[in-house]
Amino acid sequence: MWGVVATATYETVYISFASTLLAVLVGVPVGIWTFLTGKNEILQNNRTHFVLNTIINIGRSIPFIILLLILLPVTRFIVGTVLGTTAAIIPLSICAMPFVARLTANALMEIPNGLTEAAQAMGATKWQIVRKFYLSEALPTLINGVTLTLVTLVGYSAMAGTQGGGGLGSLAINYGRIRNMPYVTWVATIIIVLFVMISQKLGDTLAKKVDHR
């Protein structure tokens, strides 16, 4: 039994981290682009900003369980199946991408207005402004955002597990409910809570470590 619990725990960790990584790889650049094309920013483009903003808002407004069903054909096309841990990563990462993009854009909006002028006065290029000034200044907030995304996806992964995605959610359903072993549900819940608490603590510690403000 404990071997099954260990496997389910590994699956949840795998799903959560892989989904977060994909969401960050797409969401952070989109969030940066959204911010940079905003009003009075260095790449201001009202049309592009409007399109990106609209896509992000639409993506964030769709409930995960509905998005999970909508993306079944996409998941089947990419992975070859809609069941299993790898298949669960597709809807989870797509669900989190607009969330990460919004967190990134908001983090950059918190940067003091005078930073751009100071960077330009030092002769920095637009790319240097983004990399050495904006991202450096916003890094603690971005780390907090990634941590929030990870712990959110842990909960969503349990939801995906009830639809055949594997992990602790699937364990709780298959053993706790169907096989009438309620203690398994409690074990799965405790493991999820511990994973979230540890992830949050590590994220908070890292954010404080890189915060030199």
From Swiss-Prot:
<feature type="transmembrane region" description="Helical">
    <location>
        <begin position="139"/>
        <end position="159"/>
    </location>
</feature>
<keyword id="KW-0472">Membrane</keyword>
<feature type="domain" description="ABC transmembrane type-1">
    <location>
        <begin position="9"/>
        <end position="202"/>
    </location>
</feature>
<dbReference type="Pfam" id="PF00528">
    <property type="entry name" value="BPD_transp_1"/>
</dbReference>
<dbReference type="InterPro" id="IPR000515">
    <property type="entry name" value="MetI-like"/>
</dbReference>
<feature type="transmembrane region" description="Helical">
    <location>
        <begin position="183"/>
        <end position="203"/>
    </location>
</feature>
<dbReference type="InterPro" id="IPR051322">
    <property type="entry name" value="AA_ABC_Transporter_Permease"/>
</dbReference>
<keyword id="KW-0812">Transmembrane</keyword>
<dbReference type="GO" id="GO:0048473">
    <property type="term" value="P:D-methionine transmembrane transport"/>
</dbReference>
<keyword id="KW-1133">Transmembrane helix</keyword>
<feature type="transmembrane region" description="Helical">
    <location>
        <begin position="50"/>
        <end position="72"/>
    </location>
</feature>
<feature type="transmembrane region" description="Helical">
    <location>
        <begin position="13"/>
        <end position="33"/>
    </location>
</feature>
<feature type="transmembrane region" description="Helical">
    <location>
        <begin position="89"/>
        <end position="109"/>
    </location>
</feature>
<dbReference type="InterPro" id="IPR035906">
    <property type="entry name" value="MetI-like_sf"/>
</dbReference>
<dbReference type="GO" id="GO:0005886">
    <property type="term" value="C:plasma membrane"/>
</dbReference>
<comment type="function">
    <text>Part of the binding-protein-dependent transport system for D-methionine. Probably responsible for the translocation of the substrate across the membrane.</text>
</comment>
<keyword id="KW-1003">Cell membrane</keyword>
<comment type="similarity">
    <text>Belongs to the binding-protein-dependent transport system permease family. CysTW subfamily.</text>
</comment>
<keyword id="KW-0813">Transport</keyword>
<keyword id="KW-0997">Cell inner membrane</keyword>
<protein>
    <recommendedName>
        <fullName>Probable D-methionine transport system permease protein MetI</fullName>
    </recommendedName>
</protein>
